[in-house]
């Protein structure tokens, strides 16, 4: 409430509320189509290629240095990561004022979204062609997941476009805002190699999120085949 921008309000209103569009077959097809277009125009995509520095000439970023020592030269470099991390990769430069760099670096991070995916029994719940927002109380600004009480502040329920019979739900996504700080203890670990405490927390949050949604949509409980965080 104290820090949300006009952009946040516009995105929430026009994307999450008025424009709850869905893709039959999932959104991976968008990434696949983009990848195909890049290759069609002679482009190359590098995966597992960590960037360690952005090199500048004058007032422009002209090169990307990878961890394996390769240097990629380009007329235009687009960074889609946190601005503070982008500045760290650029390093000291007169182009970015020190006061601005420090201000960006001192801004508090916002929250992330914890997601749970529910596979449903076929032909049990009619397709829900809209987003549903469930709140724990009347104060809609208290939305963060309470890790001490193990309870969501709010949950967004969104049904994926069915792959089979369009009249029935087959997959439901639950999303709830959660602070990023509790996860910092595992920021150095890799997917598939997380400590037991990490997986235990995700399992507990998944169950709490599912329970929260089922309390407000009771018919969901008996239709669950599988849940996954």
Annotate each language-model stretch with its function.
Residues 33, 37, 41, 80, ...:
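Generic, well-ordered alpha-helical scaffold segments in large soluble proteins
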Residues 1-4:
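Rossmann-like flavin
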Residues 14-53:
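Helical element adjacent to the flavin cofactor pocket in flavoenzyme catalytic cores
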Residues 167-223:
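C-terminal catalytic lobe of FAD-dependent flavoproteins
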Residues 10-17, 190:
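Short glycine/proline-rich turn/loop motifs
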Residues 226-229:
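Conserved small/polar residues in nucleotide/adenosyl-binding loops
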Residues 22, 52-167:
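Mid-domain catalytic core of redox enzymes
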